[in-house]
């Protein structure tokens, strides 16, 4: 006789969202002892991840979703993860990681075995002709010469990159894959897990058997027969697990920030975050619980890459600006929001406007770039400007735009701090003067050259007129040459330059006199047609 329909949901606390918050930590002193054995990535030194109210012996499959490190510590979980990577044609990543783990356990004194294993790992995964090459950055490439002096930790950097790639990219897809959902369902029903690579979970009869229900009965909400769902529709099965979690557990788990450094080829799966948000919202609507729905409804998230290389998740809540959304993250990380530029990943040409609504960044990735600001006091112009530049720029590069605006060059100015005579080297990085005030002085010869420079249009317009009035110009003396004819001294003659300036001013004045004539007080007489009748010459007052 069929009994009541069995609820297949996992009890509260047994399902943790697949957002790992484990942190790659260095090995402690006790772990690093003993002939260079062990590594910060050793499976014995991996962080345990978030604690669970249920032991891993009771619920081993559910514990796989708590952290990537806990998955690697379970041999069966590692086997299922390897099978998943085979379907994605990236099983060489976990194979390389396991090979590095075994390599680090070789004593440093056993140079023969180290050399043999290092040769095998290099030619199988890292060389240009490798049979199963792994995806690592150019900075982590190794040449074959390093095999001459093998060390237990010689592949640590490459192993770290592959570890981050699996943790932040492959692991997020594994915990929401149909393969993992089948394992969760089998564990919830008490069925034994199938061996990785086989076609069915447990007994084929139990795996394919459709639940028989009494008339008028139905399966619990969110639970359907897995075999009848297409591949893309297999995900709603997770809705039954999330339904029984406390209301704040979903939000708190989603707010966890990843503490490990991100590899350039690894990224957080934002599609999974959007799926969690949409499924949670639709599930609450189906339950018909209207109380507090607007307050507890989770929104979509934005992945924020920080300047130090780490990543964080920000809730794109409607009604908030991008500035408000990032204020909490910047305050927590000790960043000054006015000194931050925000760029969309892949579109770094133009920074985002922080006053627009943050919902435009839902399911998007943004990158924060820090800017160094300092105050620059222009003595000659009596102005104070605020300059913002990248930390990697030098002072001469940051000052170039303001100097070009005022027609100056780097050899015409000096930079120093207020009240100090010691000059600031323009080759220093901008980060060395962060939040400081600098004074920009111009050299005396720079001021002279700026005052003596005459626009070509003015000089060309007045020179032809002065050719007809040579009597007004004093003869040019031989002392007006800027440099000596022999070129031995090469020094500028300041007095001759001043004489040239006075001469050019007189040339301009002569040109104006030739055109308009000298304006005197006697010449300022109104024409007759503009004068009043009483002011006209020869006019008489009419008799009364």
From Swiss-Prot:
Record's comment on post-translational modification: Phosphorylated by PKC. Phosphorylation is increased in presence of forskolin and may enhance the GDI activity on G(i) alpha subunit GNAI1.
Annotated phenotype, changing residue 494 to D: Increases the GDI activity against GNAI1. Does not alter GTPase activity against GNAO1 or GNAI1
Domain GoLoco: 497-519
Main location: nucleus
Positions with biased composition (Polar residues): 23-58
Keywords: Cell cycle, Cell division, Cell membrane, Cell projection, Cytoplasm, Cytoskeleton, Developmental protein, GTPase activation, Membrane, Microtubule, Nucleus, Phosphoprotein, Repeat, Signal transduction inhibitor, Synapse
Disordered: region residues: 19-59, 191-220, 449-493
Reported tissue expression: Expressed in neurons of the V2 secondary visual cortex area (at protein level). Expressed at high levels in the brain cortex, hippocampus, striatum, thalamus and substantia nigra, in the lung, and spleen. Low expression has been found in heart, liver, skeletal muscle and testis.
Annotated ranges, domain RBD: 300-371, 373-443
Example GO biological process: learning
InterPro entries xrefs: GoLoco_motif (IPR003109), RBD1_RGS14 (IPR046992), RBD2_RGS14 (IPR046993), RBD_dom (IPR003116), RGS (IPR016137), RGS10/12/14-like (IPR046995), RGS14_RGS (IPR037881), RGS_sf (IPR036305)
Subcellular location: Nucleus; Nucleus, PML body; Cytoplasm; Membrane
Mutagenesis / variant outcome for changing residue 258 to A: Inhibits phosphorylation
SUPFAM superfamilies to which the protein is assigned, alphabetical: Regulator of G-protein signaling, RGS, Ubiquitin-like
Residue numbers bearing the Phosphoserine modification: 20, 42, 45, 143, 199, 203, 218, 286, 481
Effect of residue 333 to L: Abolishes the inhibition of PDGF-mediated ERK1/ERK2 phosphorylation. Inhibits interaction with HRAS and does not colocalize with active GTP-bound form of HRAS at membranes. Does not inhibit interaction with BRAF or RAF1
Domain RGS: 67-184
Record remark: domains: The RGS domain is necessary for GTPase-activating protein (GAP) activity for G subunits and localization to the nucleus and centrosomes.
Assembly and interaction partners: Interacts with GNAI1, GNAI2 and GNAI3. Interacts with GNAO1. Interacts (via RGS and GoLoco domains) with GNAI1; the interaction occurs in the centrosomes. Interaction with GNAI1 or GNAI3 (via active GTP- or inactive GDP-bound forms) prevents association of RGS14 with centrosomes or nuclear localization. Interacts with RABGEF1; the interactions is GTP-dependent. Interacts with RAP2A; the interactions is GTP-dependent and does not alter its function on G(i) alpha subunits either as GAP or as GDI. Associates with microtubules. Found in a complex with at least BRAF, HRAS, MAP2K1, MAPK3 and RGS14.
Protein name: Regulator of G-protein signaling 14
């Amino acid at each position: 006789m069929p009994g009541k329909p069995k609820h297949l949901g996992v009890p509260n606390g047994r399902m943790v969202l697949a957002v790992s918050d484990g942190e790659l930590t260095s090995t402690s002193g006790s772990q690093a002892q003993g002939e260079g054995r062990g590594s910060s990535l050793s499976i014995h030194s991996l962080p345990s991840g978030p604690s669970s109210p249920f032991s891993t012996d009771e619920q081993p499959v559910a514990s796989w979703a708590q952290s990537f490190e806990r998955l690697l510590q379970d041999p069966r979980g590692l086997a299922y993860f390897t099978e998943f990577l085979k379907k994605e044609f990236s099983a060489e990543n976990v194979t390389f990681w396991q090979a590095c783990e075994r390599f680090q356990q070789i004593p440093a004194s056993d140079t023969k075995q180290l050399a043999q294993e290092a040769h095998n790992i290099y030619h199988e995964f890292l060389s240009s002709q490798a049979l199963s090459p792994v995806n690592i950055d150019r900075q982590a490439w190794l040449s074959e010469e390093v095999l001459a002096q093998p060390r237990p930790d010689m592949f640590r950097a490459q192993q770290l990159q592959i570890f981050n790639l699996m943790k932040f990219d492959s692991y997020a897809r594994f915990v929401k894959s149909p393969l993992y959902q089948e394992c969760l369902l089998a564990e919830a029903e008490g069925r034994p897990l199938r061996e990785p690579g086989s076609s069915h979970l447990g007994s084929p009869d139990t795996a394919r058997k459709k639940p028989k229900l009494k008339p008028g009965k139905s399966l619990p909400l969110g639970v359907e027969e897995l075999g009848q769902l297409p591949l893309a529709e297999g995900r709603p099965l997770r809705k039954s697990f999330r339904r029984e979690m406390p209301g704040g557990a979903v939000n708190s788990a989603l707010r966890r920030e990843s503490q490990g450094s991100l590899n350039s080829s690894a990224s957080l799966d934002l599609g999974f975050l959007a799926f969690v948000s949409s499924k949670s919202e639709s599930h609450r609507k189906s339950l018909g619980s209207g109380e507090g729905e607007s307050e507890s409804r989770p929104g979509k998230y934005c992945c924020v890459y920080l300047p130090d290389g780490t990543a964080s998740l920000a809730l794109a809540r409607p009604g908030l600006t991008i500035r408000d959304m990032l204020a909490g993250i910047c305050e927590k990380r000790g960043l000054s929001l006015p000194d931050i530029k925000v760029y969309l990943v892949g579109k770094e040409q133009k920074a985002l406007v922080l006053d627009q609504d943050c919902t435009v960044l839902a399911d998007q990735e943004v990158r924060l770039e820090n800017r160094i600001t300092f105050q620059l006091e222009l003595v000659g112009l009596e102005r104070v400007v605020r300059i913002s530049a990248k930390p990697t720029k030098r002072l001469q590069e940051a000052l170039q735009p303001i100097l070009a605006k005022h027609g100056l060059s780097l050899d015409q100015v000096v930079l120093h701090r207020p009240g100090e005579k010691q000059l600031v080297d323009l080759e220093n990085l901008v980060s060395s003067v962060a939040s400081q005030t600098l004074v920009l002085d111009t050299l005396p010869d720079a001021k002279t050259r700026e005052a003596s420079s005459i626009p070509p249009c003015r000089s060309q317009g007045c020179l032809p007129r002065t050719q007809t009035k040579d009597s007004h110009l004093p003869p040019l003396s031989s002392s007006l040459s800027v440099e000596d004819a022999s070129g031995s001294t090469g020094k500028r003659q300041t007095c001759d330059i001043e004489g040239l300036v006075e001469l050019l001013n007189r040339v301009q004045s002569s040109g104006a006199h030739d055109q308009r004539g000298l304006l005197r007080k006697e010449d300022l007489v109104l024409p007759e047609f503009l004068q009043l009748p009483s002011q006209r010459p020869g006019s008489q007052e009419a008799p009364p």
